[in-house]
Amino acid sequence: MKTRIIFAALALAAAMPLLVSGVFAADGAAPAKVPSGPHPITQEIPADPMAKEITDDHKRARNYADQPPLIPHAIRDYQIDLNINKCMTCHDRKNTEGSQAPMISVTHFQDRDGQTLGAVSPRRYFCTQCHVPQTDAQPITGNRFRDIDSILAGGKEGAK
């Protein structure tokens, strides 16, 4: 029992710097329009307008290996909960012929032990955990990401 308590205390002590740095990092990433200094707690700041979804049904190229595909259509009112998954009305194995939608990956039918199931694995059931619709949102911060093809094409310059 004492060993467990000591182990838990050491684990918490080791994790504390990470937790604290996460708080400060989140604080530093706050939008610039948040008022600084004293302000009424009831002050409401309007939210930025939502980015427009790109719904042209064009399949987007992936930027890195194993990137989940983007959703090329609107899903605003799709019900995805324990009772219903609207995505499955088109993307389930049984429905793809009629809908012409791509079937979900066979990996979605495997449980955590790699066993193939007859239906979608519960851990893959909530599509929007990984798959997101594409929007015309502008980046909040600069992005220097380059995919492997652009790095290889750039030669030494891309190998930084």
UniProtKB/Swiss-Prot annotation:
<dbReference type="Pfam" id="PF03892">
    <property type="entry name" value="NapB"/>
</dbReference>
<dbReference type="InterPro" id="IPR005591">
    <property type="entry name" value="NapB"/>
</dbReference>
<comment type="subunit">
    <text>Component of the periplasmic nitrate reductase NapAB complex composed of NapA and NapB.</text>
</comment>
<dbReference type="GO" id="GO:0046872">
    <property type="term" value="F:metal ion binding"/>
</dbReference>
<keyword id="KW-0813">Transport</keyword>
<feature type="binding site" description="axial binding residue">
    <location>
        <position position="91"/>
    </location>
    <ligand>
        <name>heme c 1</name>
    </ligand>
</feature>
<comment type="similarity">
    <text>Belongs to the NapB family.</text>
</comment>
<feature type="binding site" description="covalent">
    <location>
        <position position="90"/>
    </location>
    <ligand>
        <name>heme c 1</name>
    </ligand>
</feature>
<feature type="binding site" description="covalent">
    <location>
        <position position="127"/>
    </location>
    <ligand>
        <name>heme c 2</name>
    </ligand>
</feature>
<feature type="binding site" description="covalent">
    <location>
        <position position="130"/>
    </location>
    <ligand>
        <name>heme c 2</name>
    </ligand>
</feature>
<keyword id="KW-0249">Electron transport</keyword>
<dbReference type="GO" id="GO:0009061">
    <property type="term" value="P:anaerobic respiration"/>
</dbReference>
<keyword id="KW-0349">Heme</keyword>
<feature type="binding site" description="axial binding residue">
    <location>
        <position position="108"/>
    </location>
    <ligand>
        <name>heme c 2</name>
    </ligand>
</feature>
<feature type="signal peptide">
    <location>
        <begin position="1"/>
        <end position="25"/>
    </location>
</feature>
<dbReference type="InterPro" id="IPR036280">
    <property type="entry name" value="Multihaem_cyt_sf"/>
</dbReference>
<keyword id="KW-0574">Periplasm</keyword>
<keyword id="KW-0479">Metal-binding</keyword>
<feature type="binding site" description="covalent">
    <location>
        <position position="87"/>
    </location>
    <ligand>
        <name>heme c 1</name>
    </ligand>
</feature>
<comment type="function">
    <text>Electron transfer subunit of the periplasmic nitrate reductase complex NapAB. Receives electrons from the membrane-anchored tetraheme c-type NapC protein and transfers these to NapA subunit, thus allowing electron flow between membrane and periplasm. Essential for periplasmic nitrate reduction with nitrate as the terminal electron acceptor.</text>
</comment>
<feature type="binding site" description="axial binding residue">
    <location>
        <position position="131"/>
    </location>
    <ligand>
        <name>heme c 2</name>
    </ligand>
</feature>
<keyword id="KW-0408">Iron</keyword>
<dbReference type="GO" id="GO:0042597">
    <property type="term" value="C:periplasmic space"/>
</dbReference>
<keyword id="KW-0732">Signal</keyword>
<protein>
    <recommendedName>
        <fullName>Periplasmic nitrate reductase, electron transfer subunit</fullName>
    </recommendedName>
</protein>
<feature type="binding site" description="axial binding residue">
    <location>
        <position position="73"/>
    </location>
    <ligand>
        <name>heme c 1</name>
    </ligand>
</feature>
